């Protein structure tokens, strides 16, 4: 089985090295990742310049584009390689709740799903670098189970690994997305020339970490797996919307 791996932290990130190393024990792996950190770019594609595919000394390929670009390049530009499955990650930091809408890690998996492939995004609920051993041990468990009977149809799964010691992981839970308050305040500043500039502020506090949510269960020490879908249609609102826009 051929597995394409990407991320949004860049091809030099620790997480993608771990994911590639473990996945290589189960499948034929190729890595195509951004040449630099592209966190938070969501599903954006590069349309204002051509893309270049280069190979690093460790064998990984990297692209001067976004995670979504990397999936397109990995699908159509790699010599003698057609992916059957796509893994994205391991992201340095969680991708849960509303944050999945901004995540380049989740976006890479989403693009693969749209192309008709099973896709899994992996993230570690920690940005300090202290729990990579937990992530690696969790991956061995997750991928051993995945490859026993790989999905035969496209799926889109978002996996988050807790920030606990390896021996303290409590198991796996299937969850729904939680929510957070969006309090991304603008932080004003000045550049060295004295010109006004702005930074996007920190994310808001989590507002829904109830039992059964990714925020709640991952925070309690569980590996969370959340099945995602692409269809954004608000089906319960169809009738109300039709009534509002009725013009006869």
Swiss-Prot record:
Ligand binding (a divalent metal cation): 8-9, 39, 91
Pfam families the UniProt entry points to: SurE
Annotated cofactor note: Binds 1 divalent metal cation per subunit.
Catalytic activity from the UniProt record: a ribonucleoside 5'-phosphate + H2O = a ribonucleoside + phosphate
EC number: 3.1.3.5
GO molecular function, one term: metal ion binding
Transport is among the record's keywords: no
Cofactor field: a divalent metal cation
Record InterPro entries: SurE, SurE-like_Pase/nucleotidase, SurE-like_sf
Top-level division of the source organism's lineage: Bacteria
Gene Ontology cellular component terms for the protein in this record: cytoplasm
Cellular localization per UniProt: Cytoplasm
Keyword annotations: Cytoplasm, Hydrolase, Metal-binding, Nucleotide-binding
Predominant subcellular localization, coarse grouping: cytoplasm
Function: Nucleotidase that shows phosphatase activity on nucleoside 5'-monophosphates.
Similarity field: Belongs to the SurE nucleotidase family.
Protein name: 5'-nucleotidase SurE
Source organism phylogeny: Bacteria, Pseudomonadati, Pseudomonadota, Betaproteobacteria, Neisseriales
